[in-house]
């Protein structure tokens, strides 16, 4: 229902369909007796219904990224995991962290594993307010550590979490450094990741917010330069649109040509630089610009499969 505060998908298996039904109804009976909450349940047993319900979590990020407004759910603390028995305490304390910093955060999770994806709603940061992101991460991770959790439960540590690994692993971090020195003494492999003395690595490589140049001509169609800038800003340059995986469909033209300019992110970068005034807007009337623009036939597979659902067409 639209008034619901949360939803939880629970799957039970059995050797027979009746055994699965009995187990599901035991779960329902248990949660309906919880004090102080109203629980509405829906049972699904056909393959079509089950597949539909399990498809719902896949729609969370696309829906979040398409929400209108100046703020966006930024994925910089989205991979924490805590012991399942500590979930209740952690969620209360995590909400207090967001209240302290006056932000709202989305939340979806793999509850049985204690895996939480939190995305605070913030504007794309400028160099002046980037410190806010680091402060939110630091305060939230302190809560994670205090309940025996990890800041990287499902994905890699990467640049955004490297600065906090020393706090998570303590003296064991020295062993990480020794291993790095043995196998990569010249720091050639993924420099700056996992092993780094930079305390501000989380915000060091942020892509700044683009403010459209005042010299841009007014668009002739029903769009604005602010809208173009916001859409281009959704691209973080991860390169997922260059995938060759057989279970994905983006980007057909890049798969055929293997040219960077054919990739969706190339168009986002091009429009970002034009909007910012780094490139002359008259470039859009050139043959070179048309050649890049023509490397898209509006199939919208990038919008469907991009991690941040950038609508390149």
Identify the meaning behind each predicted range:
Residues 1, 42-58, 108-121, 153-165, ...:
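A glycine-rich phosphate-binding loop feature that marks nucleotide/adenosyl-phosphate handling sites
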Residues 201, 206-238, 242-313:
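Ferredoxin-type iron-sulfur electron-transfer modules in oxidoreductases and energy-metabolism complexes
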Residues 1-71, 109-111, 195, 256-271, ...:
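Terminal amphipathic helices with adjacent charged low-complexity linkers/tails
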Residues 1, 31-53, 104-108, 147-154, ...:
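Flexible, glycine/charged-enriched surface loops at secondary-structure junctions
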Residues 4-14, 68-80, 116-124, 159-167:
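Short, hydrophobic beta-strand segments
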Residues 63-67, 71, 168-225, 233:
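Activity-critical C-terminal alpha-helical subdomain
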Residues 84-94, 101-161, 175-179, 231, ...:
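Extended, hydrophobic alpha-helical segments in both membrane/secreted and soluble proteins
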């Amino acid at each position: 229902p639209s008034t619901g505060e949360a939803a939880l998908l629970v799957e039970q298996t059995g050797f027979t369909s009746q055994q699965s039904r009995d187990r599901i109804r035991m779960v329902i009976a248990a949660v309906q007796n919880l004090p102080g909450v109203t629980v509405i349940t829906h049972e699904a047993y056909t393959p079509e219904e089950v597949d539909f319900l399990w498809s719902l979590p896949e729609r969370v990020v696309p829906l979040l990224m398409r929400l209108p407004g100046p703020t966006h759910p930024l994925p910089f603390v989205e991979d924490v995991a805590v012991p399942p028995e500590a979930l209740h305490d952690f969620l209360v304390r995590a909400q207090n962290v967001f209240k302290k910093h006056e932000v709202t955060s989305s939340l979806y999770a793999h509850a049985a594993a204690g895996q939480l994806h939190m995305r605070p709603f913030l504007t794309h940061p400028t160099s002046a307010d980037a410190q806010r992101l680091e402060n939110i991460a630091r305060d939230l991770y302190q809560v994670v550590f205090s309940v025996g959790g990890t800041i990287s439960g499902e994905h890699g540590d990467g640049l955004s979490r490297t600065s906090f690994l020393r706090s998570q692993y303590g003296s064991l971090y020295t062993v990480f450094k020794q291993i790095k020195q043995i196998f990569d003494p010249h720091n050639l492999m993924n420099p700056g990741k996992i092993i780094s003395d930079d305390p501000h690595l989380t915000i060091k490589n942020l892509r700044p917010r683009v403010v459209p140049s005042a010299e841009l001509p007014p668009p002739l169609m029903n769009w604005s330069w602010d809208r173009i800038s916001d859409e281009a800003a959704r691209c973080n340059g991860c390169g997922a649109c260059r995938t060759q995986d057989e279970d994905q469909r983006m980007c057909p033209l890049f798969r055929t040509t293997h040219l960077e300019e054919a990739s969706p992110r190339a168009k986002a970068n091009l429009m970002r630089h034009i909007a910012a005034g780094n490139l002359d807007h008259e470039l859009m009337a050139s043959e070179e610009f048309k050649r890049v623009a023509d490397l898209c036939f509006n199939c919208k597979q990038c919008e469907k499969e991009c991690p941040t659902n950038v609508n390149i067409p």
